[in-house]
Amino acid sequence: MKKEVIVGSRDSALALWQTNWVVERLSKIHPEINFKIVTMKTKGDKILDVALAKIGDKGLFTKELEHALLNKTIDMAVHSMKDLPTVLPEGLKIGAFCEREYPGDVFISPKGFKFLELPQGARIGTSSLRRIAQILAVRPDLQAIPLRGNLPTRFRKMEEMDLDGIILAYAGVKRLGYEDKITEMLSFDLCLPAVGQGSIGVEIRADDTFIEELLKPIDHFATNRAIRAERAFLKRLEGGCQIPIGAYSEVKENRLHLKGVVASLDGKLVIKGEKEGSIEEPEKVGISLAEELLTKGAQKILEEIRRDANE
């Protein structure tokens, strides 16, 4: 009889696509194992009428899966890397960083507008503070309209609310087959992605060497190094979804290149920077860029946002 490995997943269409993607690869590599998917709803799936920044809870899309891991009811949990907090619960770790899809954002306009050609005061659907701050930095006249839910829900709301456009992660749009709706790919100069965007991560128990070995073939070297740098950058800034922070790292010619941004909520102050370093020291690259941005003015932005959040 085949050994069974239980894989935990959120129950959204995108989460299941990603979990099936992981399981298909693992099943080919380990045909002697039966991988069984178990789904569950997270707090972030249940609260859809409030912006994530207002809920203000880390691990909104991961906690239930992490509890199942720690309770040993599942053997691994598949996440969007951008949902995984930089500090994991004690006893858990990331077992694999799967090869990254293009991590950028896309602009979708039912009216066919290119982003920079939007009319004055155009209404753009997004609840992401990172996206709002970066688009306001370029177009302060735009109105950001809160928009949450799965992709079909967002497309429906876009039409119902007569929005001029919405901003989404390319990876999710592609994975669910909505590429034909894309009006424009947003450049990194305009909008740096969320930390980990475009990559699927597999979380495991830190002491489970059997599962760790199973995952090694799907841990993608360049993605592993890039996202570790981004996560170290975010962790040093102590940023969650309440703070507009973007980052993108890639391996080029055996060196790690990292771009980062911290912005005020209104987009009036934007602190950007870049860092290059050794692929063997991704955390060092991330921390170094974070500290550089803190001295360039990011510290002031972070303090103001945290003070306002506590009032």
UniProtKB/Swiss-Prot annotation:
Q: Which InterPro entries match?
A: HemC, Porphobilin_deaminase_cofac_BS, Porphobilin_deaminase_N, Porphobilinogen_deaminase_C, Porphobilinogen_deaminase_C_sf
Quaternary organization: Monomer.
For this chain, the family text in UniProt reads: Belongs to the HMBS family.
- Which gene produces this protein? hemC
CDD domains for this protein: PBP2_EcHMBS_like (cd13646)
> SUPFAM superfamilies this protein is in?
Periplasmic binding protein-like II, Porphobilinogen deaminase (hydroxymethylbilane synthase), C-terminal domain
PROSITE patterns recorded: PORPHOBILINOGEN_DEAM
Give the molecular function GO annotations. Answer: hydroxymethylbilane synthase activity
What does the record give as cofactor? dipyrromethane
Provide the positions where the record notes the PTM S-(dipyrrolylmethanemethyl)cysteine.
C241
Which GO cellular component terms are attached? cytoplasm
What does the function comment of this entry state? Answer: Tetrapolymerization of the monopyrrole PBG into the hydroxymethylbilane pre-uroporphyrinogen in several discrete steps.
The pathway noted for it is: Porphyrin-containing compound metabolism; protoporphyrin-IX biosynthesis; coproporphyrinogen-III from 5-aminolevulinate: step 2/4
List the EC numbers from the record.
2.5.1.61
* The protein's name: Porphobilinogen deaminase
Alphabetically sorted, this entry's keywords are: Porphyrin biosynthesis, Transferase
